[in-house]
């Protein structure tokens, strides 16, 4: 591979305040002497990771590029902003993003009758994984995905098992 593409949360970025100056995709790109494009952003969630990855690959040459995706927490909920929040951080894009955390909004969520917080998060996470995996497979883009933050897929729900085992 000549190029490495990386996307995720802060665990795929340097974090100098924490004394962390390297990250997985940086180490791999240096080891392989490959160009690195990194769209990872601290505190962001999986919707942004999936969508911005597909936008980048549609705007750039897919050939000779290996994708590394470090999934964020399924309890980080991204939304597109209309205020230009941190505009310009990702070249060639107009969208800007913010994130709210499920566990910071439990009072609101509990007011919604029957909202199953954990199963909702698991469903969204599985959907993000399979959506991006399908995109990579369809476009013949080699990739690896892993949980940069913990996510619970050990749920015995028939619907989830159907998707996980497909």
What residue spans do the PLM features occupy?
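Serine-esterase "nucleophile elbow" of acetyl-processing enzymes
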Residues: 1-52, 58-60
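Alpha-helical cap/lid subdomain in secreted, periplasmic
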Residues: 54-166
């Amino acid at each position: 591979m000549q190029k490495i593409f990386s996307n995720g949360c802060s665990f795929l970025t340097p974090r100098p305040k924490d004394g962390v100056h390297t990250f997985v995709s940086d180490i791999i790109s240096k080891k392989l002497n490959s160009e690195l494009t990194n769209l990872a952003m601290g505190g962001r969630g999986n919707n942004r990771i999936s969508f911005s990855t597909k936008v980048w690959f549609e705007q750039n040459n897919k050939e000779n590029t290996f994708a590394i995706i470090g999934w964020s927490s399924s309890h980080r909920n991204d939304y597109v902003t209309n205020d230009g929040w941190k505009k310009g951080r990702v070249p060639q894009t107009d969208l800007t993003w913010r994130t709210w955390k499920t566990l910071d909004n439990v009072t609101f969520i509990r007011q919604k009758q029957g909202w199953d917080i954990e199963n909702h998060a698991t469903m969204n996470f599985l959907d993000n994984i399979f959506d991006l995996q399908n995109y990579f497979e369809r476009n013949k883009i080699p990739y690896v995905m892993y949980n940069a933050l913990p996510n619970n897929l050990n749920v015995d729900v028939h619907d989830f098992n159907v998707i996980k085992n497909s």
